[in-house]
């Protein structure tokens, strides 16, 4: 089945990790086929939180990345709920384990891409959004920025990149306590090949994978529910560059790549709101 964040978000009563019992300790690892992240490897990774009515806690709903001391890049579908206000969200930065000494940042503005649109099988286009924090963050080894690509950067099929998050470790299998951030290496899959896979599985004749989408992953190596909005990064000339934003997929870790918003398609839009220096 398709994994769509809106099916698991706390305001719909879905399954979301909550604050761990201090007595629980599990060593199982995930994203899908992933490993625990060493400290300070991905200092731009953030957790987007929503105040769950049932738990009374700020629950993790999506990932995101810090691209400016006061701005977070995430997926539009993470913040697509009609009437959702910035004041109902929080962002946690510099954390490897969810809910471990939370110091949540207030969100003051949500900017969804105006072309964002949902279809029955996923998202047609522009699954990208910006969140403005209440105040600029002080950068450090634990909290830092990821570089964005230039709009002309070409990410070749077969290139190995990394996706990170606190999402499910398999279909309907949440990341267990202590909710340690996961990473997995995934190969880039060309849009034509990716589109053929999805046309077949979804029985669609129309184009499924648009030009502003990017595919990555292989059997047993994938992002999953609750990873949405998180970064797909590639090592480029000794610099980590964010090339994708986790968007949607069919199952988790099957022999189908995950689908990401292609960051190069939206760098110019991002610059309209945030003054940034492009990467390679």
Curated annotation (Swiss-Prot):
Keywords: Cytoplasm, Disulfide bond, Glycoprotein, Hydrolase, Protease, Serine protease, Signal, Zymogen. GO terms for biological process: proteolysis. Its main location: cytoplasm. Mononuclear cells within skin, intestine, trachea and lung parenchyma, and polymorphonuclear leukocytes within capillaries and blood. InterPro entries: Peptidase_S1_PA, Peptidase_S1_PA_chymotrypsin, Peptidase_S1A, Trypsin_dom, TRYPSIN_HIS. PANTHER family: CHYMOTRYPSIN-LIKE PROTEASE CTRL-1-RELATED, TRANSMEMBRANE PROTEASE SERINE. This is Mastin. It comes from Canis lupus familiaris (Dog).
């Amino acid at each position: 089945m398709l994994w769509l964040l809106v099916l698991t978000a706390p305001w719909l009563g879905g399954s979301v990790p909550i604050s761990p019992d201090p007595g629980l300790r599990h060593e199982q690892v995930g994203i899908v086929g992933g490993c625990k992240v060493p400290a300070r490897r991905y200092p731009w990774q953030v957790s987007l939180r929503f105040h769950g009515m049932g738990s009374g806690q700020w629950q993790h709903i999506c990932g995101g990345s810090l691209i400016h001391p006061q701005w977070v890049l995430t997926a539009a579908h993470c913040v697509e709920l009609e009437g959702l206000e910035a004041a109902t969200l929080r962002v946690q930065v510099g954390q490897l384990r969810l809910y471990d000494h939370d110091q949540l940042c207030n969100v003051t503005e949500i900017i969804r891409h105006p072309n964002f649109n949902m279809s029955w099988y996923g998202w047609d286009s522009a699954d990208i959004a910006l969140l403005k924090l209440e105040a600029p963050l002080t950068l450090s080894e634990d909290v830092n920025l990821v570089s964005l690509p230039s709009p002309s950067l070409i990410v070749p099929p077969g290139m190995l990149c990394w996706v990170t998050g606190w999402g499910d470790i398999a279909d309907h299998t949440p990341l267990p306590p202590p909710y340690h951030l996961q990473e997995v290496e995934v190969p880039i899959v060309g849009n034509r090949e990716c589109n053929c896979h999805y046309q077949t599985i979804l029985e669609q004749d129309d184009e499924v994978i648009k030009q502003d989408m990017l595919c990555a992953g292989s059997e047993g190596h994938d992002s999953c529910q609750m990873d949405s909005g998180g970064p797909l990064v590639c090592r480029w000339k000794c610099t980590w560059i964010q090339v994708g934003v986790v968007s949607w997929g069919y199952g988790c870790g099957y022999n189908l790549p995950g689908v990401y918003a292609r960051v190069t398609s939206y760098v110019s839009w991002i610059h309209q709101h945030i003054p940034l220096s492009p990467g390679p």
